[in-house]
Swiss-Prot record:
Species this chain originates from: Thermotoga neapolitana (strain ATCC 49049 / DSM 4359 / NBRC 107923 / NS-E)
Catalytic activity: (S)-2,3,4,5-tetrahydrodipicolinate + acetyl-CoA + H2O = L-2-acetamido-6-oxoheptanedioate + CoA
Organism lineage: Bacteria, Thermotogati, Thermotogota, Thermotogae, Thermotogales
Gene name of the encoded protein: dapH
One GO BP: lysine biosynthetic process via diaminopimelate
Protein function: Catalyzes the transfer of an acetyl group from acetyl-CoA to tetrahydrodipicolinate.
Family to which this protein belongs: Belongs to the transferase hexapeptide repeat family. DapH subfamily.
Molecular function GO labels: tetrahydrodipicolinate N-acetyltransferase activity
PANTHER family: 2,3,4,5-TETRAHYDROPYRIDINE-2,6-DICARBOXYLATE N-ACETYLTRANSFERASE (PTHR43300:SF10), ACETYLTRANSFERASE (PTHR43300)
InterPro entries found in the cross-reference section: DapH, DapH_N, Hexapep, Hexapep_transf_CS, Trans_hexapeptide_repeat, Trimer_LpxA-like_sf
Protein's name in the database: 2,3,4,5-tetrahydropyridine-2,6-dicarboxylate N-acetyltransferase
Keywords: Acyltransferase, Amino-acid biosynthesis, Diaminopimelate biosynthesis, Lysine biosynthesis, Repeat, Transferase
Length: 238
C-alpha cells in the first residue's frame, strides 16, 4: 500500500505559524450606505446585507458604525482556528452532509464519507473506502483501499509527539462499529476488527480480532468474507 505520509513536524509548524482565525457570517439591517465593507465579502444593498469575514473586523465595524446598524445576527464558525476545512470539491468521492474534513487530507476516488464522520489533518483515505457515520479518523492515520470503517469507530491520530508512528490500516480491512485502533497499530490486509474491539497491537493479515484488548480469534474464512463483503454499488459516483 503506497501512501503519501504527512510529516508531523510539518503539521505542527503549520499550526504554530498559521494566523488563527475566527470566521463569521453576519446578517445586518440598517442604513448601510456609506459603511466601509472592504474587509468583508458583502452581499446586499443599503438596507440589508450578509457579511463573510473575521470576528475582530466585525467588532470594529460595530464600534465605528453602530449608530447605522439597527440589528444583526452573528454566526461564529470557529474560534482561533489554526487550520481550515478542506475544499471538498477537489475530491472525486461521495461526501455526505455533516462530515468534517480538515485541510491536508487525501481522499481516494470512490471513497464514501458518511454523515458526522470526522477526518483530521494529514489523514489518508484510500480509493473505495467507506468512513461510516460518526467515525473519527485521527491526524496522519492511513487507511488503505476498499476498507470499511464502521459507525462510531475511532482511528487514533498522532500529531504529538511528532516521532510517534501513525495508525496504518491496509487494504480491504473491515473495522466494526465503535471499535478503537490505538496509536502506532498496523492492521494487516483483509483483516476484520470486531465491533467494540480495542486494538492495542498489530493485527496480522487475513485474521479476525475481537475483545478488549483485541486478540486473534480466527483466520478469515469464506463465511466471514461474505458477511463483511464490500458493496461496490455504494461507491458508484454516476
Amino acid at each position: 500500500m503506497e501512501v503519501n505520509e504527512v510529516d508531523a513536524r510539518e503539521i505542527i509548524e503549520m499550526i504554530a505559524k498559521s494566523k488563527k482565525k475566527t470566521p463569521i457570517v453576519a446578517y445586518i439591517k440598517g442604513k448601510l450606505d456609506g459603511i466601509d465593507f472592504s474587509k468583508f465579502k458583502f452581499f446586499g444593498n443599503d438596507q440589508f446585507g450578509v457579511l463573510f469575514g473575521e470576528y475582530e473586523d466585525f467588532r470594529e465595524l460595530l464600534e465605528k458604525y453602530g449608530e447605522k446598524i439597527e440589528d444583526y445576527h452573528l454566526e461564529v464558525k470557529a474560534r482561533n482556528s489554526a487550520l481550515p476545512l478542506a475544499d471538498i470539491t477537489k475530491y472525486r468521492a461521495r461526501i455526505e452532509p455533516g462530515a468534517i474534513i480538515r485541510d491536508m487530507v487525501e481522499i481516494g476516488e470512490g471513497a464514501v464519507i458518511m454523515m458526522g464522520a470526522v477526518i483530521n489533518v494529514g489523514a489518508v483515505i484510500g480509493e473505495g473506502t467507506m468512513i461510516d457515520m460518526n467515525a473519527v479518523v485521527g491526524g496522519r492515520a492511513i487507511i488503505g483501499k476498499k476498507c470499511h470503517i464502521g459507525a462510531g469507530a475511532v482511528i487514533a491520530g498522532v500529531i504529538e509527539p511528532p516521532s510517534a508512528k501513525p495508525v496504518v490500516i491496509e487494504d480491504e480491512v473491515v473495522v466494526g462499529a465503535n471499535a478503537v485502533i490505538l496509536e502506532g497499530v498496523t492492521v494487516g490486509k483483509g483483516s476484520v476488527v470486531a465491533a467494540g474491539a480495542v486494538v492495542t497491537k498489530d493485527v496480522p493479515p487475513y485474521t479476525v480480532v475481537a475483545g478488549v484488548p483485541a486478540r486473534v480469534i480466527k483466520q478469515i474464512d469464506e463465511k466471514t468474507k461474505e458477511k463483511t463483503r464490500i458493496v461496490d454499488e455504494l461507491r458508484n459516483l454516476e
